[in-house]
């Protein structure tokens, strides 16, 4: 896996990320095309679940570790697929094994209390699969 620092501005139109995988599986390919081509602006600054996720990432990692005894390491980089550099991933962290080596992807999501667990899993399954492919976990 190639790693590119998030400190550099990543042009999201230059690759396919995990959220994009969700759009593709949901059949929203036209919406994704318009975003990638710059025909519509993707402004997530007022999307509450996105903002909650950004502002609570550290807490979510700590909470997961407290509940599972599995440490989570923050990932501060945009990951690139080792063969296809247009396949990208911005993961919330790595779940570590007893040797403190990555054994899985940590991805926290904010949903409302009325959303059923099966619905959440179905919605985000493509994104997590995408992240596991890119991170090789």
Task: Annotate the PLM regions.
Residues 1-55, 59:
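Charged, glycine-rich intrinsically disordered N-terminal tails and low-complexity linkers that flank
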Residues 59-61, 67-137:
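Mg2+/Mn2+-dependent nuclease catalytic core
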């Amino acid at each position: 896996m190639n790693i590119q620092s998030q400190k550099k501005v990543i042009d999201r139109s230059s690759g396919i990320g995990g959220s994009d995988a969700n759009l593709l599986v949901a059949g929203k390919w036209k919406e994704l095309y318009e975003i990638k081509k710059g025909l519509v602006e993707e402004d997530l600054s007022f999307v509450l679940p996105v903002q909650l996720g950004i502002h609570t990432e550290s807490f979510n990692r700590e909470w997961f570790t407290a509940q599972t005894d599995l440490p989570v390491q923050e990932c501060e980089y945009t990951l690139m697929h080792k063969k296809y550099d247009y396949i990208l991933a911005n993961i919330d962290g790595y779940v570590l094994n007893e040797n403190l080596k990555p054994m899985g992807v940590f991805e926290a999501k904010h949903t409302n209390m009325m959303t059923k667990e099966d619905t959440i899993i179905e919605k985000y399954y493509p994104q997590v699969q995408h992240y596991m492919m890119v991170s090789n976990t």
